């Protein structure tokens, strides 16, 4: 090995701390950009695909209460592909024999087998509860220490309690998407409402559109038509919610977070470049006398330049 390259490796060894600092700064910057870019591609694509696979509703109508006839009029509205009605109400629940109460949003289905909007994915046990049975959404298990086969106590408005067994666990990626403050969900049949002292009326309508499932303007037009139609028939609409089929409600939030992380990764790369420049400047100042000796014994400018570039390359490879 030529003497000048021996000197390069000797300098690297003598400045181990600076060498490692440069290497780690470059590695962190490149790694962060690679990971964030990969995460962006995976999350942005898979999140939307999995969301769309559950046939999410494009329009959600929250009302004071309606019956099967009103649902039929919604289904027959021009531009509507499908519509389902449910009753949603909240109750305090606890595992039988314990003291801790947890609030759950109860969702009552008319027909679980005919479910075509906001599909439920079975995870454990039965996905179709019978009369006086309940199925929990997966997130509810983080709030209620219960397993399939256990019994839950439900507190009614007058303070009395009713019990129902947990017969299954499902995943619902569509209904609570985008609502950070939503309570965990539990699912019962409409035949259980009288047992829970709830009126056997729907208060939510979930609608999918025939065309333009990714056109939010078209979806809003259909939603406005449905709202006008219901209110003209005497059904007061409290709130409407719109969402596209292939865009998760949290997609913009996730993309914004990933964008911030990407900017931080790029900033790290720029900061590491500044660190490298300062380190090389300090090394050159240390080597002024060495460079003078090299030139004194016949070293050319090109050779000195190659030494410093080689010094930098070795730091980068290390």
Where are these regions (language model features)?
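Membrane transport/envelope proteins' first extracytoplasmic loop
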Residues: 1, 5-9, 14-270, 315
């Amino acid at each position: 090995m030529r003497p000048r390259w021996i000197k390069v490796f000797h300098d690297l060894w003598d400045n181990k701390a600076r060498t490692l600092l440069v290497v780690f700064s470059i590695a962190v910057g490149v790694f962060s950009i690679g990971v964030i870019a990969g995460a962006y591609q995976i999350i942005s694509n898979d999140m939307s695909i999995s969301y769309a696979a559950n046939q999410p509703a494009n329009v959600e109508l929250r009302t004071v209460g309606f019956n099967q006839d009103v649902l039929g009029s919604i289904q027959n509205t021009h531009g509507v592909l499908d519509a389902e009605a449910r009753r949603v109400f909240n109750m305090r629940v606890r595992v039988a024999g314990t003291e801790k109460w947890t609030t759950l949003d109860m969702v009552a289905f008319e027909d679980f087998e005919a479910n075509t909007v906001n599909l439920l994915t079975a995870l454990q046990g039965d996905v179709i509860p019978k009369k006086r049975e309940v199925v929990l959404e997966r997130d509810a298990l983080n709030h209620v220490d219960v397993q399939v086969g256990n019994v839950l106590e439900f507190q009614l408005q007058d303070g009395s309690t009713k019990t129902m067994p947990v017969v299954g666990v499902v995943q619902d990626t569509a209904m609570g998407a985008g609502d950070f403050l939503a309570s965990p969900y539990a699912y019962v049949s409409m035949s259980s409402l009288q047992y829970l002292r709830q009126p056997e009326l729907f208060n939510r309508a979930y609608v999918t559109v025939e065309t333009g499932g990714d056109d939010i303007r078209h979806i809003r037009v259909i939603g406005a038509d449905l709202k006008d139609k219901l209110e003209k028939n005497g059904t007061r609409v409290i709130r409407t919610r719109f969402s596209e089929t292939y865009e998760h409600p949290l997609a913009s939030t996730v993309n914004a977070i990933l964008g911030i992380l990407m900017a931080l990764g790029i900033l790290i790369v720029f900061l590491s470049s500044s660190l490298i420049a300062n380190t090389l400047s300090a090394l050159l100042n240390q080597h002024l006398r060495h460079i003078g000796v090299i030139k004194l014994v016949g070293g050319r400018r090109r050779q000195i330049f190659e030494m410093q570039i080689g010094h930098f390359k070795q730091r980068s490879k290390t």
